[in-house]
Amino acid sequence: MSPRMPNPSLVVPDVLPPMRALVKAVNSVGVPLKTLVLIHLRVSQINGRPVQIPKKQAEFEAAGEEDHRLPVVETWREQDCFTDAERSCLALAEAATRINDREDPVSDEVWEEAAKHWNEVELGAIVLHIGLVNLWNRVNVATKQEPVDWRINPKKWTPMTSRLAQAQAQPAASSSH
């Protein structure tokens, strides 16, 4: 798949720095990174955004992964390896992503279960994280951006990092509008 254009966050002036700042703020309130990763993966799965994750123990170890639950996130309800707090986030992520599936997409039951495990600031960060993942999924799908390898440690997201660096080095295409 060849991208239709560079990532819009690199093309539109002054967009990427505030988006990065928002991600940094969301990541700094105390929700464990592993929980945010589970949310990111589940939202991307729902949106049909391909995510390349290791499928075998040896691949996890070679990649330096710590969380061997990633391949079973799609079937989290049937798994016993997720905490109640993580389950509440996955349910909230599904509900907030599938907003057209039912009349009341995020039911009081889903919200109240999440609120049992997270304080208001953490819950706000989780909701914002869900929204940000949905935003990035839609941008990437619309512009046919290539999926990146999935890594728990953001420093290991080298395919995206190298693509961003390459795109930033190239001048943006001028518009005739």
Give, region by region, the residue ranges found by the protein language model.
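Hydrophobic alpha-helical segments
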Residues: 1-177
